[in-house]
């Protein structure tokens, strides 16, 4: 592990996670380069702010489920290479039904340099503490469509309210939202704003 980084569950005790890119359940359809274990890594500063967010969410009856944190540069390169491949339709319906995979970059869903590689970005959602069920957000994680935008039309009032709740929790815990993805937040005062790391998650 790089100095300054930690497994988030070692700091944010009791947090739930499902490291999608370590599994077959992601838009590439297979585990992604650089993810060798199903755990989530981030900077210590990210972990401390997430702990604050977890505590704030709990006062409202919610918990945090994490999908991705630190992302090795090799994983980003894997995304870029995948986006350049001919369409095979294996994941299109589930993740990008209304665009071509070649448009993922131009539309802002995939970037050649990711804030995740700096170690202080997080992808997450809320779940109800009383039932353990994920709250409805109007689209799935990594759904590359306008429906995933914070200002999306066509989602229910409850889904919009849930997005606002997550955003309020995160912004009050030191994070900034990304307008195109309701699940993506970056630490406002990140410790390595100009560094992109490539050590594997293991």
From Swiss-Prot:
E.C. numbers: 3.4.13.22
GO MF term (any one): metallopeptidase activity
InterPro entries the UniProt entry points to: A_A_dipeptidase, Hedgehog_sig/DD-Pept_Zn-bd_sf
Activity control summary: Inhibited by aminoalkyl phosphinate analogs.
Obligatory cofactor(s): Zn(2+); Fe(2+); Co(2+); Ni(2+)
The protein's enzyme class: hydrolase
Note accompanying the cofactor annotation: Binds 1 zinc ion per subunit. Can also be activated by other divalent cations such as iron, cobalt, or nickel.
Active site: 181
pH dependence: Optimum pH is 7-9.
Catalytic activity: D-alanyl-D-alanine + H2O = 2 D-alanine
Keywords assigned by UniProt, alphabetized: Antibiotic resistance, Cell wall biogenesis/degradation, Dipeptidase, Hydrolase, Metal-binding, Metalloprotease, Plasmid, Protease, Zinc
Induction notes from the record: By vancomycin, mediated by VanS/VanR.
Gene Ontology biological process terms in this record: cell wall organization; proteolysis; response to antibiotic
Subunit structure comment from the entry: Homodimer.
Job of this protein: Catalyzes hydrolysis of the D-alanyl-D-alanine dipeptide.
HAMAP family: A_A_dipeptidase
Family label: Belongs to the peptidase M15D family.
The protein's name: D-alanyl-D-alanine dipeptidase
């Amino acid at each position: 592990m790089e100095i300054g980084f930690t497994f988030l569950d070692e700091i944010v005790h009791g947090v739930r996670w499902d490291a999608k890119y370590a599994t077959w359940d992601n838009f590439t359809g297979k585990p992604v380069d650089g993810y060798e274990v199903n755990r989530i890594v981030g900077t210590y500063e990210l972990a401390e702010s997430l702990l604050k967010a977890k505590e704030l969410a709990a006062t409202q009856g919610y918990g945090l489920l994490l999908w991705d944190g630190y992302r090795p540069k090799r994983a980003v390169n894997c995304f870029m290479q995948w986006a350049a491949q001919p369409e095979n339709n294996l994941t299109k319906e589930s993740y990008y039904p209304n665009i071509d995979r070649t448009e993922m970059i131009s539309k802002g869903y995939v970037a050649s340099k990711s804030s995740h590689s700096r170690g202080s970005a997080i992808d997450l959602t809320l779940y109800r503490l009383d039932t353990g069920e994920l709250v409805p957000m109007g689209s799935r994680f990594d759904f590359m469509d306008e429906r995933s935008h914070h200002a999306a039309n066509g989602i229910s009032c409850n889904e919009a309210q849930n997005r606002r709740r997550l955003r309020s929790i995160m912004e009050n815990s030191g994070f900034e939202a990304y307008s195109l993805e309701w699940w993506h937040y970056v630490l406002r005062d990140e410790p390595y704003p100009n560094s992109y790391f490539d050590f594997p998650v293991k």
